[in-house]
Design a protein with these regions (language model features):
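Thiol-based oxidoreductase modules, predominantly thioredoxin-like and allied folds used
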Residues: 70-87, 103-114
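Conserved helix-turn-beta segment immediately C-terminal to the redox Cys motif
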Residues: 38-42, 50, 54-79, 97-100
């Protein structure tokens, strides 16, 4: 009986979803998977170029550089809040590189809420974590994923990327 319970538990653990399950596209339109970052933490951020929080791109890049051995920052441009990401993927990429020197991975534009929510964000907004679940409230919400692809923390937009709250969790 114990062996059966162990087998069931292992089946559940191995079949539980993780961020590695989702098919994504880069801002250049190429297929990619977050699975390439297994073994490192991920900081997934919904971004926008015309938002009061847009200067966080600079801190996100600093975080990506300073903690490159521990975490990969991945930006997901989204136009869900006040039309603050109206540009094309090419325009978004150029804006981020020119104004903030962004070199961390960016996905193509996605929807992070509503009927057309991207599957990754549907998962992230409902996945158990010690902080909170539910719909994203604004641009630059952050999701910290562990080395095994599980959500471990979620931060609202006002939490800066280099805050102690985030850096201690790395």
């Amino acid at each position: 009986m114990k062996a059966f319970a162990l087998i069931l538990a292992l089946m559940f653990v191995t079949s539980a979803p993780s961020v590695y399950s989702f098919k994504l596209k880069t801002i250049d339109g190429k297929d990619f998977s977050l699975a390439k970052y297994k073994g490192k933490k991920l900081l997934v951020v919904n971004t926008a170029s015309k938002c009061g929080f847009t200067p966080q791109y600079a801190e996100l890049q600093k975080l990506a550089d300073q903690y490159a051995d521990k975490v990969v920052v991945v930006g997901f441009p989204a136009n869900n809040f006040g039309g603050q990401e109206p540009g094309t993927n090419t325009e978004v990429k150029e804006f981020c590189q020119k104004n903030y020197g962004v070199t961390f991975p960016l996905s193509e534009k996605v929807s992070v809420k509503g009927d057309d929510i991207a599957p990754l964000f549907k998962y992230l907004t409902s996945a158990p974590n010690p902080d909170f679940t539910g719909e994203i409230k604004w641009n630059f919400e952050k999701f910290l994923i562990d080395e095994n692809g599980k959500l471990i923390h979620r931060y609202r937009s006002n939490v800066k990327p280099l805050s102690e709250e985030i850096t201690k969790a790395l």
